[in-house]
Swiss-Prot record:
Main location: nucleus
Motif Nuclear localization signal in this chain: 392-399
Pfam families: UTP15_C, WD40
Subcellular localization: Nucleus, Nucleolus
Source species taxonomy: Eukaryota, Viridiplantae, Streptophyta, Embryophyta, Tracheophyta
GO molecular function (one): mRNA binding
Keywords on record: Cell cycle, Cell division, Developmental protein, Nucleus, Repeat, rRNA processing, WD repeat
Summary of the knockout phenotype: Embryo sac development arrest at two-, four-, or eight-nucleate stages, associated with abnormal nuclear numbers and positions in embryo sac, aberrant embryo sacs and unfused polar nuclei. Disrupted progression of the mitotic division cycles of the female gametophyte leading to an impaired synchrony of female gametophyte development. Reduced root growth and accumulation of unprocessed 18S pre-rRNA.
Gene: SWA1
SMART domains assigned: WD40
Name listed for the protein in its UniProt record: Protein SLOW WALKER 1
């Protein structure tokens, strides 16, 4: 009995230490909905007509109502961003590869595989400018963010061209890429800065103000670069090549900040999206059919969405209300944010009183100058996000000699500026008179007192380095043309004596400098040989 009790006791202890559990079954994974996923899920799909061929490029107008330009085959179609219906079509001779809007939304530029860049008015079908210089297919075209007069384009000839649109001429050819140039972008903070990406695996940073082929910085992505975009700060850029997206710090010397390799196939397009929280996200699409949202501040993919076709292009409206993605089979996947029923945190209530107030508002008589409310209109109006700030032009205050020049009273303008005794202004007026070919005529018409002021000015400043290039030649001309008036006048003797002394002193200084140069030059040559 004792042994049987001991065995039962041991069995009881074992059952407590190792309790029997039912087999666990797989449960559906329920991800908690984040504000990020709620934001991107709020885009409601809209049906758009399928296009004939691959959608090569998408671009939204930067101004309200943010028209959409879609490049497909040899056509650019304009769509309304509100109804997503086609409003106008523009035809090209070859397949369109890129399209972009000007900062005011009045014009757009597009390039095709024939190497031609064309500029259109959105209300006209005829091209305003046709820019021909690329010797191979043109792959991208961009307007600077605020510059309305220039364009940047690049193509398979490996050349980046900076255009003067008004003159339809190339200002500078930026040479440096060793393979096809496929993408580029302009800085959001400096209209002269731009970046370009190439199939030679590099991204180059250029300054359009320097009319040479020397780039400012070079970044090696490691794979053929398909797209490059500036991030809103202007100090960071994002590059897409292969299945990776990388963020680089230009201010920090081109150092890589982070890398994302969540796509399975080549990334084809990048865009920057502005969230409701005023934060920015990097959005990418790829041939694997996925759209990825990347928080580059935390180096984390925050949202992913699958589409039933390889994706070629991406467009996001500036107001964040529309998202458009172009597929390789001509499909356009458009999404618009759902209209919320909540305004200011409270739901709209459709009661009888609101309906009556709406009717009363519609029946109110038009305001006229005879009504008191006419003079109070707009006082309580608050600015909206789509309003334009128009700066009042400040009136330019002209000096007396500027006013005289506007009236073509040349001699009076010269005498007036001589009386001010400001050498920089005097030389500026003289240069203007030289451009008008009136300087010597003014000198020949001067009275004795006015001629004395001119000689006094020449005596004091003709040897000053900043002004000597103009004043030395003018002094010689004045002495030759007014020699008879100067010789017999006692009041001019002192001025001529001082002028002669200044010129002789300048000659001695020049001779001394030449002697010093003669001594130093052989020593420099000897030092260079050793």
């Amino acid at each position: 009995m004792e042994e049987e009790l001991r065995v039962r006791l041991n069995d009881h202890q074992v059952s407590k230490v190792f309790p029997v559990k039912p087999k666990s079954t797989a449960k559906p994974v329920s991800e908690s909905e984040t504000p990020e996923s709620r934001y991107w899920s709020s885009f409601k799909n809209h049906s758009t007509p399928n296009l004939v061929s691959s959608v090569a490029a998408l671009a939204f107008s930067p101004v309200h109502p943010h028209s959409l330009a879609v490049a497909h085959s040899a056509t650019v179609s304009l769509f309304s961003s509100q109804s997503l219906s086609s409003s106008r079509r523009f035809s090209f001779r070859d397949v369109v590869s890129s399209v972009c809007f000007r900062s005011d939304g009045a014009l757009f530029a597009a390039c095709d595989l024939s190497g031609v860049v064309q500029v259109f008015d959105i209300k006209e079908r005829m091209a305003l400018r046709t820019l021909r210089s690329h010797s191979a297919p043109a792959r991208f075209v961009k307007y600077p963010v605020q510059d309305k007069l220039h364009l940047v384009s690049g193509g398979d000839d490996g050349v980046v061209k900076y255009w003067d649109v008004a003159g339809a001429t190339v200002i500078s050819d930026l040479l440096g890429h060793k393979d096809y140039v496929r993408c580029g972008d302009c800085s959001p903070v400096n209209d002269s800065m731009l970046v370009t990406g190439s199939y030679d695996h590099t991204v180059k940073v250029w300054d359009a103000r320097v009319h040479t082929s020397n780039w400012i910085a070079e970044i090696n992505h490691g794979l053929p670069v398909e797209d490059v975009v500036y991030l809103p700060s202007g100090g960071l850029i994002a590059t897409a090549g292969g299945n990776s997206v990388k963020v680089w710090d230009l201010i920090g010397g081109g150092k890589m900040v982070c890398s994302m390799e969540s796509h399975n196939k080549t990334v084809t397009s990048l865009r920057v999206a502005r969230m409701e929280s005023a934060e920015s996200r990097l959005v990418s699409v790829a041939l694997d059919g996925y759209m990825k949202v990347f928080d580059y501040g935390r180096a984390k993919v925050t949202y992913s969405m699958r589409f039933p076709a390889p994706l070629m292009s991406l467009g996001l409206s500036p107001d964040g209300s529309t998202r458009v993605i172009g597929g390789s089979n001509g499909m356009v996947f458009a999404g618009k944010k759902k209209v919320r029923d909540v305004v200011g945190g409270q739901k709209k209530s459709l009661n009888l009183w609101s309906l009556i107030s709406d009717v009363d508002e519609s029946r109110r008589r038009a305001l006229r100058p005879t009504y008191f409310r006419y003079f109070q209109r707009g006082q309580s109006e608050k600015p909206s996000k789509d309003d334009y700030l128009v700066k009042e032009k400040k009136g330019l205050k002209l000096t007396r000699h500027d006013k005289l020049l506007k009236k073509f009273r040349h001699k009076e303008a010269l005498v007036s500026v001589l009386e001010e005794k400001k050498p920089a202004n005097v030389v500026a007026v003289m240069e203007e008179l030289v451009a008008r070919r009136k300087l010597m005529k003014c000198v020949s018409n001067m009275e004795e007192g006015e001629l004395g002021m001119l000689l006094g000015f020449l005596q004091r400043y003709c040897t000053v380095q900043r002004y000597s290039g103009l004043l030395m030649g003018l002094t010689k001309k004045v002495l030759e043309t007014r020699a008879e008036d100067i010789k017999g006048k006692n009041e001019f003797k002192g001025l001529l004596r001082n002028l002669k002394r200044e010129v002789n002193q300048e000659i001695r200084i020049q001779q001394s400098l030449l002697e010093i140069q003669g001594v130093i030059a052989p020593l420099m040559r000897i030092a260079g040989r050793s």
